[in-house]
Amino acid sequence: MKQYLEALEYILENGKDRDDRTGVGTRGVFGYQMRFDLRKEFPAVTTKKLAWKSVVSELLWFLEGSSDERRLAEIHYGKPREELVGKNTIWTANADKQAKDLGYVNTDTIKDLGPVYGHQWRTWDAALGFVDQIAEVLENMHYDPNSRRHIVSAWNADRVNVMALPPCHTMFQFHIQDGELSCQLYQRSADMFLGVPFNIASYSLLTHMFAQLLDLKVGDFVWTGGDCHIYQNHFEQVKQQIIRTPVAGPTLEMPAFKDLDELVKTTPNDYKLIGYNPMDSIKAPMAV
């Protein structure tokens, strides 16, 4: 993850300061790219601790197609929602603020976020029903591996204004070459300290999952960012992180699954990072 530390340092030194939606203020650059070789190791940040269980929980929640924050809590904690009152997830703040302001149901057991990622991935609204983009991209990669159309988008312009949070990681594309599956993500808005290590791990895991479904090996994960920023109240944490020296990354251990239905029935505890030895966590507030 040396390239990630280099990105932080570059933005801190060369970025421009500007106001933002949250009122916190950022320093950022427009346009940045990083490439990770998934053949060698899993790109989990080692210069601070990655919230791995949260990464897996959210991805399984997306793949299930849910937009209920309390369903994410069930996946993460492995308990029914009735037992999880007061137990938060990484989406609770958005549910209790933006989604509530939009008029969505917000109770102890249901917290609707509107048509966010999972909805767009699995039930994109179409003229004659809906499109299951995940099922379609898997089918298309199986039958037409050389296609340049292996794309999933979460950016639905007609629905953005009714989402609790418009998608930050907006679209991703797969590429198959020589029996290897690679993935490129475009992230329109990139919280470089808190969000990006999480997103890198999430889409790298997705690439491993889909490679297993398609009986392929993994290739590269390419991360491309649009507005790449560091929040002003993260400056000291970033300075602390970039002086740390990264160590070797882990390898990924996944459960067996042969189709999408079996995949979405797996649990966060089924996915393990072997040989993951991160340094201490660096706490920072999330801008909402």
Question: Where do the language-model regions lie?
Answer:
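Terminal, non-catalytic protein-protein interaction segments that mediate quaternary/complex assembly
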Residues: 1-288
